[in-house]
Design a protein with these regions (language model features):
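Carbohydrate-associated surface elements
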Residues: 181, 204
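Acidic anion/phosphate-binding donor-loop and adjacent secondary structure
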Residues: 136-140, 187, 205-219
Length: 220
């Protein structure tokens, strides 16, 4: 398959979910084009590493001021700040009319707008990897965080995110999440009680790096 993989941050060994997905797809013989945003020069080495196994890696600089400007524009609306934080249309414009791709894969709530853009301007199937249910994370942070600023930010965006995620899960050909809990909560948010096309794909574990050390004694 020829896959257009859109990530609103540079995949690396810290942002392991998109990194492992991209690498695994490439190892299986798929042609993967990665579109991603970078925010600082330190990420250039990660970008060069992606080029070792991706067909194409297309990047755009995303300065912090632009993310803040995006958020300021939606503050008076009902849309969550996360939905526009990483919005940079120049990232995808060169690819909108390329019908050679079999599927578009977009990651995270911050990347979902790119998927919506493709749904509006092309006929290519779009998969959205929500990763986590952000509503669930905001509910936890607003109730449990000891950081007052974090609690305030979570409460500010919570209702917007609940409504938006409930609408968003029905906009794509397939939705992916990391855990059954995230699937359950996203499904409960779905507009009009519809059943969205959500699949659970857990984060993988590289067994060549993570395995029991037989030299270390364990408690029975």
């Amino acid at each position: 398959m020829k896959i257009l993989f859109i990530v609103p941050y540079v995949p690396n060994l810290v942002r392991v979910r998109p990194y492992n997905m991209i690498r695994s797809l490439a190892e299986r013989g798929h042609q993967v084009t990665v579109l991603t945003l970078w925010t600082n020069e330190a990420e250039q080495s990660d970008i060069e590493h992606l080029r070792e196994f991706c067909d194409v890696v297309h990047t755009i600089h995303m300065p912090g001021w632009r993310s803040l400007w995006n958020c300021a524009q939606v503050l008076p609306t009902r849309d969550p700040l996360q939905s526009v934080y990483s919005w940079q249309p120049a990232l995808v414009e060169p690819f909108l009319n390329d019908a050679s791709y079999d599927v578009v894969h977009v990651e995270h709530l911050r990347g979902a707008r790119y998927g919506l853009h493709f749904k509006q301007h092309s006929n290519i199937p779009v998969v959205w990897d929500s990763v986590d249910c952000i509503t669930h994370l905001f509910r936890q942070a607003s109730a449990q965080s000891t950081d007052r600023l974090r609690r305030w930010r979570s409460r500010l965006d919570l209702k917007r995110t609940e409504r938006y995620e409930g609408w968003l899960v029905n906009q794509f050909d397939r939705v992916l999440v990391t855990s059954p809990t995230d699937k359950q909560i996203l499904t409960s948010l779905s507009e009009n009680g519809s059943t969205p096309p959500i699949e659970v794909i857990p984060n993988g574990v590289a067994l060549q790096y993570f395995y029991p050390d037989t030299a270390v004694s364990r408690e029975a």
